[in-house]
């Protein structure tokens, strides 16, 4: 049976991937992050190993020991864990010391490069999850109003700017005013802040 590795963060995304991969008949080897990954992931995978944020050497060893050559990352890790609660192993310490910028995109690309250097291919996170991807176009029963279209365009421009700055991935707007911007606290907190 083909194996796939799962680097699991928080939320339901890792569970959705594990279920989809099992339905495809794959053996799922998961590395889960303490304090982030939902414990019920263990029910959906063939093997689960728990690590603390920064234990990159342990993470790689798990996949190598199981003969895993393809992995993907699913779910987030609260960025605050890098500064509070991380317990990096030697490889993780060396990795973090090399990182000039600890921005989300920089970290993810560097982790992927580290895995690739060990012969582990990082696959797209939506592998086997096409059914969860939104189709292009209008997804509701009605078209956006003129005002909503202005908000969409305004929000798109603002989102591209915060993306360039690597601040976050979520932005909430209304009446062409920014109500919330995702920062270190994450998407869910940005959503909570925006409720009016």
Task: Show which residues each predicted segment covers.
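Short coil/turn connectors at secondary-structure junctions
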Residues: 1-3, 24-27, 45, 66-69, ...
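N-terminal basic/disordered segments at the start of proteins
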Residues: 2-33
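N-terminal beta-loop-helix "entrance" segment that forms/cooperates
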Residues: 33-53
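N-terminal glycine-rich phosphate/adenylate-binding segment common to multiple enzyme folds
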Residues: 56-127
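Internal active-site segments that recognize and position negatively charged phosphoryl groups
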Residues: 111-124, 134-188
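Conserved small/polar residues in nucleotide/adenosyl-binding loops
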Residues: 195-196
